[in-house]
Structure formats: structure tokens, C-alpha cells
Amino acid sequence: MKGTPSFGKRNKKNHIRCRRCGRNAYNPTKKYCASCGFGRSKRLRRYSWQNKKPVTGKRLK
């Protein structure tokens, strides 16, 4: 089921506040932060697709 009654069962916290980045993205069961990667790696989790790239080489009419 996926309707309104099923949403009443969603009441437990999957993420808590992260020690490193402070965002509410640390998963205590998997023991890693979905935002900064704390618990998985020593380096900060960041990807090139997170930021929009400036438009270059586009022809203007």
C-alpha cells in the first residue's frame, strides 16, 4: 500500500544530526552521513554534478 494510511507508519528517525557537517543526514544504522560522507571516508563527499556549471560556448542569436 502507498496511500494516506501508510504514511501514518512513518514515525521513526532514519537520520540524526551529523558530527562533522551538522546536517540532519547521519544514518545511525548504516553509520555514515549521506551529506558529507562521515563514517565512510576521511575526505568530504562532494561531486562535480552538485553545482550547476556556467553556460559556455552557447551561440546567441
Curated annotation (Swiss-Prot):
Purpose: Binds to the 23S rRNA.
One family name in Pfam for this protein: Ribosomal_L37e
Coiled coil: none
Gene that encodes it: rpl37e
Binding site for Zn(2+): C18, C21, C33, C36
UniProt GO BP: translation
Entry-linked HAMAP family: Ribosomal_eL37 (MF_00547)
Zinc finger motifs (C4-type), residue ranges: 18-36
Alphabetical keyword list: Metal-binding, Ribonucleoprotein, Ribosomal protein, RNA-binding, rRNA-binding, Zinc, Zinc-finger
NCBIfam families reported in the protein's UniProt record: PRK04179.1
UniProt name for this protein: Large ribosomal subunit protein eL37
Cofactor (UniProt): Zn(2+)
Co-factor note (free text): Binds 1 zinc ion per subunit.
Database matches in InterPro entries: Ribosomal_eL37, Ribosomal_eL37/eL43, Ribosomal_eL37_CS, Ribosomal_zn-bd
Alphabetized GO MF terms: rRNA binding; structural constituent of ribosome; zinc ion binding
GO terms for cellular component: cytosolic large ribosomal subunit
PANTHER family xrefs: 60S RIBOSOMAL PROTEIN L37 (PTHR10768), RIBOSOMAL PROTEIN L37 (PTHR10768:SF0)
Keyword Metal-binding tagged: yes
Organism: Methanosphaera stadtmanae (strain ATCC 43021 / DSM 3091 / JCM 11832 / MCB-3)
Similarity comment: family membership: Belongs to the eukaryotic ribosomal protein eL37 family.
